[in-house]
Amino acid sequence: MPNAISQVRREIKHTGSMKAKIVILLYRLATMYRSRNPFYKLLGIPFVILNKLINECLFCVELPWQTRIGYGLRLYHPHCIVLNRGTVIGENCILRQGATIGSLTDSEGREGASPVIGNNVEFGAHVVVIGPVTLGDNVKIGAGTVVTKDLAAGQVVVGQPFRVLSTHREV
């Protein structure tokens, strides 16, 4: 737990606006509800409620406590961001306003698989990532792009339907 506290402190320090700091802090505190430790689980209950009330109702940012997000998350202009509870996001990712990351439902209303996103992925404004897709590490997605297929590590994509602009490799 001390390691998690220092990571959250570092994460909040490197996030820009006060609104983004509040959103991330409430989300991280709400994730205590996932703990197997009964004390942390109990401690997480009020933060699950605050996450719902403040982040979703007041700030229009849906980061469910079930969503798995690595440390280093940065939110630029955190408004109208929607993440599905089954989504998995790696470390050091950037989300901008209007980002939607979620699953598809079938004709009977059953929820399908959610996206799995690597480390150091950057989302432009109003990006939509939908369905059982995997985004590799160091992917960059341009504003307004809809992603419905897997992206390899290092790809830069834009447009609808998206097209790959380049593939960069980590040096």
Where are these regions (language model features)?
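Left-handed beta-helix
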Residues: 65, 70-71, 76-79, 84-85, ...
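Terminal amphipathic alpha-helical/low-complexity segments used for targeting or macromolecular assembly
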Residues: 1-59, 171
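Short beta-strand-to-coil "C-cap" segments at the C-terminal boundary of structured domains/repeats
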Residues: 166-170
